[in-house]
C-alpha cells in the first residue's frame, strides 16, 4: 500500500493537520496494515489510536490497545498474522463518520484480497464488524454483532467478532 497523504475525508484531513501542528513527529497519515501476506488470520480494529498508530504509522503500536493485542498475539504464539484497521486515519475523538468508514472500504477490500491463505478475520469492536460484513454483502439485521460470534463470510473465510481491546472496555469489565 501507498504511504501518501489522503485527502478523501476532509474532516479527518483537517484534524490530522491540527495534530501534526501539535505533534510534528507523528505520522498523521493513512496507516496501512502490516504482517504476513501468507497469513491465515487477519485482525481488524477500528482506526489508528491518536498516540498509537497515528504516532508510529504501524497498526496497534505505542498505546494501550496495541500493547494488549500484541501481548495476546505473542501469548498465542502466532507467527503469521496480518493486522489493520477499517479506517486508515485517526478520526477526531476516535469517532469516524459513516462516509469516512465507507471511504476506506476499497482499502479493506484491497488488503484482504492480498491475503491468499486467509481463513479467519477477527474484528475488534462492532464498527469493524459492521464494515467487514458489509464488505461481504452480509446483512447486519440477520448477523448482529455479538462478542465471540462466528459468521461464515464465504466458503473459505470465517469472521470472529470480539469486543475491542480498548482501555475503556477493560476498565469497565466489558472484557
Residue ranges and their predicted role:
Residues 1-145, 149-153, 157-175:
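A polyanion-binding, active-site-adjacent surface
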Amino acid at each position: 500500500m501507498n504511504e501518501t497523504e489522503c485527502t478523501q475525508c476532509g474532516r479527518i484531513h483537517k484534524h490530522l493537520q491540527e495534530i501534526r501542528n501539535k505533534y510534528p513527529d507523528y505520522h498523521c497519515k493513512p496507516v496501512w496494515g502490516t504482517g504476513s501476506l501468507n497469513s491465515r488470520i487477519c485482525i481488524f480494529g477500528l482506526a489508528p489510536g491518536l498516540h498509537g498508530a497515528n504516532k508510529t504509522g504501524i497498526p496497534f503500536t505505542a498505546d494501550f490497545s496495541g500493547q494488549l493485542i500484541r501481548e495476546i498475539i505473542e501469548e498465542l504464539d502466532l507467527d503469521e498474522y496480518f493486522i489493520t484497521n477499517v479506517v486508515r486515519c485517526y478520526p477526531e475523538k476516535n469517532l469516524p463518520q459513516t462516509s469516512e468508514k465507507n471511504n476506506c472500504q476499497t482499502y479493506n477490500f484491497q488488503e484482504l484480497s492480498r491475503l491468499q491463505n486467509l481463513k479467519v478475520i477477527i474484528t475488534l469492536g462492532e464498527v469493524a464488524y459492521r464494515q467487514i460484513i458489509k464488505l461481504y454483502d452480509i446483512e447486519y439485521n440477520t448477523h448482529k454483532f455479538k462478542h465471540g460470534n462466528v459468521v461464515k463470510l464465504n466458503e473459505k473465510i470465517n469472521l470472529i467478532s470480539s469486543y475491542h481491546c480498548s482501555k475503556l472496555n477493560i476498565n469497565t469489565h466489558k472484557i
